[in-house]
Amino acid sequence: MPPGSGRGGRRRAESLVREVLGLAGLRPSDRLGQHFLIDDRAVGEFLKPLEKAAAEGIREALEIGPGAGSITLPAAEVLDRIVAVELDNRLASALSRLAPARVAVITGDGVSHAAASQAPLVFSNTPFNLSPAIVEALAVNNRVAAAVLGVQYEVARRMTARPGSRDYSRLSVLVSLVFHAELAGVVRPQAYYPRPQVLTAVVTLRRRRRWRSLYARALELAGCAFTQRNKKASKVLRRCLEAAGCAPPPWLDSLGDARVWMLRPEDFVGLAEACRG
């Protein structure tokens, strides 16, 4: 039986990473943003929300970027089925040699799989440069009911920000439109090999609303508006609407002196509806 394949004998993360990298014959790639989780306590920050999902009956998952399997193999002890999508084919091949039968390791692009996945649960210690794209892909995929994501701490702050806060952004609008987001934990750089230059945060997402095609236009307007987040919202939105070929709605002037960073996600949806006609 391969190491880590039983539900009772969990491998230490550092030992597992060492073995998988040895089997793959590779060193971490800066180009691919590879940082491997080697701290068992940090692995637990990801496992706790996965165990909660499993207890609620969500037992099939997609993992984006399993790397050396630090989260994959422990997660297989609580989930019935995992499809793990790894971009690096050497890592995918090495991990597949150690993974239990309930884990299917495939080579591919994680963002594309996130958008098309049939699994109700997605988890990922995300490559930092892909975090926003992964979140957007998950938002659009209404089959995804929940997600557990490791992201750069600053991105986590934006994902969980509320209107009026310093970190509020287009990403905040996107997440809030369809998910309930919570900061579940923080992972220090020392938990990774090699060490990243930033803190990692574990964010949980729970779907609270289905994605609507209307939201794409709402996010387009939000993206335009947040390029001038400290300006008066009515003036900025008027320019954004005109650039999109839409007539500003009569209620736009009622925003008064409100700034862009004070607008609610629902305000952008209302603008998108007005733009639609």
UniProtKB/Swiss-Prot annotation:
It is found in: Cytoplasm. S-adenosyl-L-methionine binds at H35, L37, G65, E86, D109, N125. The keyword Methyltransferase applies. Specifically dimethylates two adjacent adenosines in the loop of a conserved hairpin near the 3'-end of 16S rRNA in the 30S particle. May play a critical role in biogenesis of 30S subunits. It comes from Aeropyrum pernix (strain ATCC 700893 / DSM 11879 / JCM 9820 / NBRC 100138 / K1). It is an enzyme of class 2 (transferase). It comes from the Archaea. Belongs to the class I-like SAM-binding methyltransferase superfamily. rRNA adenine N(6)-methyltransferase family. RsmA subfamily. NCBIfam families: ksgA. This is Probable ribosomal RNA small subunit methyltransferase A. One of its GO terms (cellular component) is cytoplasm.
